[in-house]
Regions:
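A short, basic/flexible loop-to-alpha-helix module at the beginning of a structural domain
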Residues: 89-101
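Short, conserved phosphate/pyrophosphate- and ester-handling motifs at nucleotide-, phospho-/glycolipid
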Residues: 32, 112, 201
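Ferredoxin-reductase
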Residues: 2-82, 139-140, 167-168
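Reductase modules of NAD(P)H-dependent flavoproteins
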Residues: 2, 131, 135, 140-228
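Histidine-anchored nucleotide/phosphate-binding helix
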Residues: 113-125
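Short, compositionally biased
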Residues: 49-59, 98-110, 215
């Protein structure tokens, strides 16, 4: 089992927090992977998996998660002050860039956005000739985690587009509305040579994956990470 200290945190959205931890030594992982945080309850070890939210940075790793009412791990993490410690295992996971990296559409809802922060911050400076589009769905505007950061990246990298969409917009919202699925097909058009990464809840993923296959996209071009 590994240990890590909380060194910083901030509110990423209502009831959603970004955590920065520092381990005892270097943490080697690929952007898109996750770690498992461990807690003990009634003599049993309970684990929860959380995607890493930043590229490799020595001994540090970032997580972003919702507070879950009645949960076990998330209330403990939200109670931590800087200097507090966690036990963790990993990294794990295969939700990473396919090689060679192709033009890609990245799709997320909720905290499914987390691995893309790690993946894009690492990859955009390295792939000026590849085009990346991030389609991110939330219910409300305040739920668009990392919105300002992705808008900044879109302004700095001409090969990156950020397309947020809301399912329950307020009257002040002038952007896209509706589920992510419809906007994915707007971006995809007639192309079938792009990789489509999908991260979020199982129902959204299954629906979109089935629709993509019906449209003729090879199943090997669809890479998924389910959060439930």
């Amino acid at each position: 089992m590994n240990r890590a200290r909380l060194i910083d945190f901030w509110e990423a959205a209502p009831e959603t927090r970004h955590f920065v931890f520092e381990a005892d030594g270097p943490v080697d992982f690929l952007p898109g992977q996750f770690v498992s945080v461990v807690a003990e309850l009634e003599g049993k070890h309970i684990t929860r998996a959380y995607s890493i939210a930043a590229p490799p940075n020595g001994a540090r790793f970032d997580l972003c998660l919702n507070r879950v009412d009645g949960g076990i791990i998330s209330p403990y993490l939200f109670s931590l002050a800087p200097g507090g410690e966690i036990e963790w295992k990993g990294p794990f996971g295969v939700f990473v860039w396919r090689k060679p990296v192709s033009d890609s559409i990245l799709v997320a809802t909720g905290t499914g956005i987390t691995p893309y922060r790690s993946m894009l911050l690492e990859r955009l400076p390295l792939e000026p000739d590849r085009h990346f589009t991030l389609v991110f769905g939330a219910r409300h505007e305040e739920g668009l985690i990392y919105r300002a950061e992705f808008e900044d990246l879109a302004g700095r990298y001409p090969n990156f587009r950020f397309l947020p969409t809301l399912t329950r917009p307020t009257g002040s919202w002038a952007g896209r509305t509706g589920r992510v699925q419809s906007h994915v097909f707007e971006v995809l058009g007639e192309r079938r040579d792009v990789d489509v990464y999908i991260c979020g809840m199982a129902a959204m993923i299954d629906d979109l994956r089935n629709s993509l296959k019906e449209k003729g996209l090879d199943r090997k071009k669809i890479i998924v990470e389910k959060y439930d």
